[in-house]
Structures are given as C-alpha cells and as structure tokens.
C-alpha cells in the first residue's frame, strides 16, 4: 500500500514539489483514497473504468473502499460521526447543516423538524425520506463542512465567525472580480452560492420559471427543476437558442437566466453580451457561473447581474476545502437587493485554509492556462482524437472579447477519442494523472465526467450533444514536458 504523504503547508506544495505531480493517484491500489492526501480532500481516486461504473451502480466492493468522496455527494466520515452523536429517535434520521436556514429548509422538505444541539443545527426526519434529505444536501450545497464536524466532535463547539478574515477574503475577490467587497458573499460551497442566487431571483419574481441557457453542471439544472416552478432548458446555448429565448421573453415573465462561462463539460461559450442585453431589456437578471473561466481570465461582471463561483476549484487550487462566492453587479438589476445568502457564510476553519490557498491563485492560473492551451493543441493534432473542446481553439469566440489582459483560456478541457466507446476506457486507464472528480487543482485530474455526472441519464445527455465517452482534464501546473510525455504514452 502507498505510504501517506507527510503533512505540509500549502506553500510548500506549490510548483513541482507537490507529491501528486510526481506520483499521481491512479493505480488500482489507490481506489477510494483521497485526492489530495488530506482528511478534508474533496476528490477521491477511481482508477479504472470498472471502478467508475461500480461506484455509480453502488457496487459494495467499490463502496467499501471509499475513504472519502466529493462532500456534496458523499457523506464524509466525520459527518457520519456527528450524525451518530446527535440524538435521534427510532425510525428517525438526522443531517447536520451549516446554518439554521439550511436545517429548517431540509426539515420542511422532509416533514421533519430543525433543532440546535450544542451549537450545531440539524434536521431530524423520518428514515423513509432520507433520500429526499440527501438530495437537499447535494443540490443546495448548504452542507456542514468536515472541518466544522471535526471541531464539534473534538471540542463540543464550533469556531466563531472570523469577520476580519472574511473581509480579507472578500476584498481579495473584489480585486479580482471588479465588484466592491460589500457586494460579495461567501458560502459553504459553489452550489450554495448558486442556490442563494436562485432564491434571490425567485423571490424577486415569485411563481415564475427560470431559464437554463446551455448545458450546465448537473446540480444547477436540478435546482431549477426541483426547487422552482419550472425551467426552460435551452441546452445548446447557441444563436438558435438565443432566438428561442427572445421569443420566450416576449410571451412569458421569467425569474432568472442561468448560464456558465464556459460550460461544463463542453467548454461552450455563450454570447454573454447579447444574452445579457436581451435579458436586461425584459428586466430579467442573468446569473453566470464562472468557475471554469475564473476571475483571472475573463471580465464578465458588465454582462452578469450575479456571478457564482466555486472557490473549491481554481481559487483554492489544493482540493482540500469547500467554498463558494456570490458577486452582485453594483450596476445590475439586483444592485438594490440584499446580498443573498449572508446568513450562512463560510466556516472559520475553512476560511483560514481558503485564504492561505488562494494567495498564489494568479500565478497558478497563468501556468495552468499555458499548459492547458498547449495540451489542447497537442490533442487537436493527434490522430487518435476526434474532437477537443477548449475555448482557445476557436478564434472567433466571444471569449476573447471578454478576456482580461494577461488572461488565458482556462485550465479545463474535454476531448473525445475516435471510437470512444472502446478507446476512452483504455486511454483513461493508461493516463498517468490522478483519476478523480473536481477541477481547478494545481495537479492535473482526469475523469470520465459524463459517466460520473449523468450515469443514470446517459441517453438524455447524448440527446443534448454530450457524448458519454468524453474525458475531462483539469490541467495542473506540472512541467509541460511531463504532461506531454504522459499523454503521448496514453495515446500511443
């Protein structure tokens, strides 16, 4: 078995010194191990195609090996320890949450009740609706973090909010985003930020549907479908869909328009200036998830009313903390609204890690941008590859119009090999990169994204133009010759 890596500060793990640069977690013996080697890792190794399928089909052999998982999809062992400590009656289950608001919402959905136990808010509900509670946990992202669970288990209390550090982090985000710190809020996860945005626009126009423009990350669409009164899904996010949206807005009052810039996993770039101008003419706010584009690369604030970002990804870069942010455009349609979601905030111990990790975000992003663009061109020229999805390969894209000076095209790309049904699993298992979910880390990650995000709806994903045999790469800051050699071997 591989030996645990020694604990080191984030600053010591930057550059080529990170253990995952030298020894990625991709061997069969790594199944279920955290990526990175941290009690609070947000990714987990699924090293073979069969492991991915087994995980999705809840194969007991695979699940027994899982030491951790992505915190919204997988209840962290520390969370389960908290659940075991919270008093529950026979026939009752419990989930701890980051705030009273989240606990009460979950309780309302499950016919249960919210209680505060030793400073910790939790929802109690009948065992038969545990799946409903887990869906709330997953989709809304208003989860209790593993660090909060650890503190409560060891000391019997949670740390108080660190207002000074919260201000430091929001001012840092303000410098990158162009919005004032007073219009930025921190959240327990990226999805929690999106859910707060959803609540804000839904409250503003109650009883109205939302629009999903372009094919999004799975849980964004689930929020609009399950928590709202309906959603108009325009999966292509192209000019034809823009025309459809124009006709829709002429006949129906819409609460909000959600999109990604670029999208996950096809890296599609919506014409955000046109989309925002159309929406503004009808008084409809536009909510943009810029997690893949990042504040470093693109300036989208003039064309968005709200920007939701998963800080878990590139801004942290280490993959050991969950966090999100929501930015309000001070000149947008929601400028006079209260900052959404300020009731939950980010747990103090997580905030400390995020602040430390994010200090070198621009430096990391520049290197990852350069590596990703080289890799995209390498793959586009390779005879085994059918298609590469990356904004930098399309010189006509609106992405360049919104690109910041010194900004790149991002660190995420997807590609489809020829004869993907047979070749993709082999390439995945030959690629000497850490094999796990998530993105934005300064060590590269590869995953069969569609299999993991849409395994039980593959035909539907295919109908939206998403091939089930795509591989998504989150490109890290390894030396380019190292990455090139690894891809050359995998594709040979």
Model-based region annotation:
Residues 1-192, 213-226, 241:
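Conserved N-terminal alpha-helix of the aminotransferase class I/II PLP-enzyme fold
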Residues 10-49, 54-58, 151-152, 339-426, ...:
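Structural motif of enzymes handling amino- and sulfur-group chemistry
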Residues 101, 313, 392-396, 417-419, ...:
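Glycine-rich beta-alpha junction loops
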Residues 176, 180-382, 389:
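Conserved PLP-enzyme active-site core in the AAT-like
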Residues 242, 419-426, 479-485:
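Short, conserved charged micro-motifs
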Residues 429-458:
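Conserved PLP cofactor-binding pocket of PLP-dependent enzymes
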Residues 486-490:
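C-terminal alpha-helix
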């Amino acid at each position: 078995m591989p030996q645990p890596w020694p604990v080191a500060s984030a600053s010591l793990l930057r550059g080529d010194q990170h253990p995952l640069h030298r020894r990625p977690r991709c061997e069969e013996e790594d199944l279920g191990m955290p990526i990175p080697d941290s009690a609070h890792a947000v990714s987990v190794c699924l090293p073979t195609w069969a492991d991915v399928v087994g995980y999705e089909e809840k194969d007991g052999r695979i699940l027994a090996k899982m030491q951790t998982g992505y915190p919204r999809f997988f209840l962290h062992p520390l969370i389960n320890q908290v659940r075991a400590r919270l008093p529950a009656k026979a026939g009752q289950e419990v989930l701890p949450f980051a705030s009273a608001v989240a606990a009460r919402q979950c309780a309302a959905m499950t016919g249960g009740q919210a209680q505060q136990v030793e400073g910790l808010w939790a929802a109690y509900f009948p065992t038969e609706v545990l799946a409903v509670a887990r869906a709330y946990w997953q989709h809304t992202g208003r989860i209790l973090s593993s660090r909060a669970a650890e503190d409560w288990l060891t000391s019997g209390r949670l740390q108080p909010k660190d207002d000074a550090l919260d201000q430091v982090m929001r001012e840092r985000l303000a410098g990158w985003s162009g919005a004032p710190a007073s219009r930025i809020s921190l959240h327990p996860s990226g999805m929690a930020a999106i859910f707060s945005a959803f609540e804000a626009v839904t409250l503003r126009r109650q009883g109205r549907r939302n629009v999903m423009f372009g094919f999004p990350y799975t849980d964004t669409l689930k929020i609009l479908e399950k928590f709202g009164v309906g959603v108009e899904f325009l999966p292509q996010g192209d000019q034809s869909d823009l025309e459809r949206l124009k006709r829709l807005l002429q006949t129906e009052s819409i609460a909000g328009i959600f999109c990604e810039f670029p999208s996950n996993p096809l890296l599609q770039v919506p014409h955000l200036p046109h989309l925002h101008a159309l929406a503004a003419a009808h008084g409809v706010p536009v909510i943009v998830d810029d997690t893949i584009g990042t504040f470093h690369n693109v300036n989208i604030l003039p064309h968005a009313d709200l920007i939701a970002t998963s800080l878990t990804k590139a801004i942290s870069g280490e993959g050991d903390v969950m966090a999100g942010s929501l930015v309000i455009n001070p000149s947008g349609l929601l400028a006079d609204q209260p900052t959404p979601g300020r009731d939950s905030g980010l747990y103090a111990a997580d905030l400390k890690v995020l602040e430390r990790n994010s200090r070198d975000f621009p430096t990391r992003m520049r290197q990852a941008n350069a590596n990703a663009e080289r890799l995209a061109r390498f793959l586009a020229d390779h005879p085994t590859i059918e298609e590469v999805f990356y904004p930098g390969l399309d010189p006509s894209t609106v992405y360049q119009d919104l690109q910041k000076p010194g900004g790149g095209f991002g660190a995420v790309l997807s590609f489809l090999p020829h004869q993907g049904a047979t070749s993709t699993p082999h390439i995945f298992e030959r690629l000497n990169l850490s094999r796990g979910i998530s993105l934005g880390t300064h060590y590269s990650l590869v995953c069969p994204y569609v299999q993991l995000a849409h395994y039980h709806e593959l035909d539907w994903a295919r109908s939206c133009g998403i091939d089930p045999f795509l591989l998504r790469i989150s490109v890290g800051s390894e030396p380019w010759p190292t990455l090139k050699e690894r891809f050359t071997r995998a594709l040979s």
